[in-house]
């Protein structure tokens, strides 16, 4: 029943555009389990008064504009829900609507290219009154996106029990509000906080704490609207998460869904065929912030003869980066007996590396992970070309300088790759026999010699 939604297979609580609605608003609902129309039974539930926090949400979204951490699609989608309550009726039915004497006050907005007119109301109460009147007069309508009370509970038997209050008992929390505070529960469980522990607060309340939530674009309503309103209303000092919506990851050419005919692969199925590092670097380069992307694991789709695209990004590490690392260690052993040479990194290599570090930091702050891959790819391929050119020298001093320069690139690349492919990078650190300060961002511009004693 939502303007713009054409889905006939939506869940009972939301349309495919993410809008929440009441069961009474459904048009000819049919149960997916029984194939029969469901019975409407009066129930009592708890709701969060989300519309009461409209001003807070508007101020919050306004503060995000111009901040590169917040994607344009996120802001646009949230703004769609911050409109006044509206009803859409066909333009040819507008005269019938205006003849209903008891209709609450509304203003009409029309767009020439649209078949419907929008009836805009002052508040949700007036809109709901109008809905009842339209149904009474058998006038077809659709409701528009707006803030509505957010349901907290349900009457299914499984789930987390809602504490009894005001004589209401026997309810369980609805899955969506539970999922909003679940990351806090996970944090408490991971830290071993128990019920009364406070360690979790340093991750959710401390001034330097910041949670980032990477979500599907169809869940913006829950994490970008309901969660922010709920956390603010609790007034317990929770830091608002940064919401990072992404487009759909298609399985092959199809949008997979646990409720659809095409099911997404389970994590264990993927891990039986690929390493976590292969998957992580592949997803990093997927450009999901810009468009829906096809995920085509050859091992699961059984594509005979085709190149496995999941391995493409990993080849940057296993081939290009690994080639540079092996060249450095083998040459160090051959020409310097495994002792790191004294000297400083040449200015062009140091300047280029510093530039890459700063660009990496900028891209990370904007979640531009695909651009990150391009940056590191070019950095390492240029280093390999430089190695091929300079390694031909027979001058021992030039070879020592080559090692200092290339080990600096290895040191920088290992630190930048560490969040993405930690296992391989940890192996490099162990071969270098240096401590974990290598990963500390406050030392990111330091040369390799900084982490070593003399004659290392």
Q: Which residues make up each language-model segment?
A:
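Structured secondary-structure scaffolds
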Residues: 4, 30-334, 372-376
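Non-catalytic interaction-recognition regions
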Residues: 284, 343-350, 355, 362
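Basic, alpha-helical terminal appendages of large translation-related enzymes
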Residues: 1-19, 23-24, 29-34, 97-103, ...
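Non-transmembrane, amphipathic alpha-helical segments
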Residues: 309-316, 345, 361-371, 398-402
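Secondary-structure edge/capping motif, primarily at the C-terminal ends of alpha-helices
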Residues: 332-335, 339, 360-367, 383-394
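Acidic/His metal-coordination segments adjacent to aromatic residues that form catalytic metal sites
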Residues: 257-264, 302-307, 354-367, 392
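Amphipathic alpha-helices that form helix-helix packing interfaces
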Residues: 321-324, 328-331, 352-356, 360, ...
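Short acidic alpha-helix initiation/capping motifs at coil-to-helix transition points
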Residues: 52, 258-263, 351-353, 405-409
């Amino acid at each position: 029943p939502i303007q713009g939604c054409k889905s006939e297979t939506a869940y009972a609580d939301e349309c495919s555009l993410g809008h929440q609605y009441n069961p009474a608003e459904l048009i000819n609902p049919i149960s997916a389990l029984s194939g029969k129309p469901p019975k409407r039974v009066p129930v009592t539930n708890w709701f969060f008064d989300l519309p009461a926090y409209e001003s807070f949400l508007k101020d919050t979204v306004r503060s995000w504009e111009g901040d590169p951490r917040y994607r344009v699609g996120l802001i646009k989608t949230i703004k769609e829900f911050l409109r006044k309550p509206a009803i859409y009726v066909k333009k040819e039915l507008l005269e019938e609507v205006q003849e209903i004497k008891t209709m609450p006050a509304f203003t009409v907005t029309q767009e020439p290219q649209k078949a419907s007119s929008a009836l805009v109301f002052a508040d949700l109460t007036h809109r709901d009154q109008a809905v009842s009147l339209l149904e009474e007069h058998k006038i077809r309508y659709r409701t528009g996106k707006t803030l509505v009370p957010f349901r907290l509970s349900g009457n299914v038997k499984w789930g987390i029990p809602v504490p009894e209050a005001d004589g209401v008992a026997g309810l369980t929390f609805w899955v969506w509000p539970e999922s909003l505070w679940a990351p806090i529960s996970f944090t408490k469980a991971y830290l071993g906080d128990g019920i009364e522990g406070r360690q979790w607060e340093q991750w959710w309340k401390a001034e330097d704490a910041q949670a980032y939530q990477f979500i599907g674009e169809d869940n913006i309503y829950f994490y970008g609207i309901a969660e922010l309103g709920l956390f603010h209303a609790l007034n317990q000092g929770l830091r608002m998460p940064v919401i990072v919506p992404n487009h759909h990851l298609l399985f092959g050419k199809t949008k997979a869904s646990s409720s659809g005919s095409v099911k997404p692969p389970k994590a264990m199925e993927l891990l039986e065929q690929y390493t976590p590092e292969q998957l992580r670097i592949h997803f990093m380069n997927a450009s999901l912030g810009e468009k829906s992307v096809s995920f085509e694991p050859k091992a699961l789709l059984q594509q005979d003869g085709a190149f496995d695209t999941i391995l493409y990004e990993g080849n940057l590490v296993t081939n290009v980066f690994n080639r540079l690392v092996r060249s450095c260690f083998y040459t160090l052993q051959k020409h310097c007996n495994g002792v790191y040479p004294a000297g400083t990194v040449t200015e062009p290599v140091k300047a280029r590396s510093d530039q890459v570090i700063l660009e990496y930091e900028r891209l990370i702050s904007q979640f531009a992970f695909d651009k990150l891959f391009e940056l590191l790819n070019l950095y390492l391929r240029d280093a390999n070309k430089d190695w091929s050119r300079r390694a031909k020298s027979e001058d021992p001093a030039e070879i020592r300088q080559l090692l200092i320069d290339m080990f600096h690139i290895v040191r920088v690349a290992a630190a930048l790759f560490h969040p993405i492919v930690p296992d391989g990078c940890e192996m490099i650190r162990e071969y270098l026999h240096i401590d974990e300060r290598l990963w500390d961002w406050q030392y990111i511009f330091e040369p390799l010699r900084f982490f070593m004693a003399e004659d290392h």
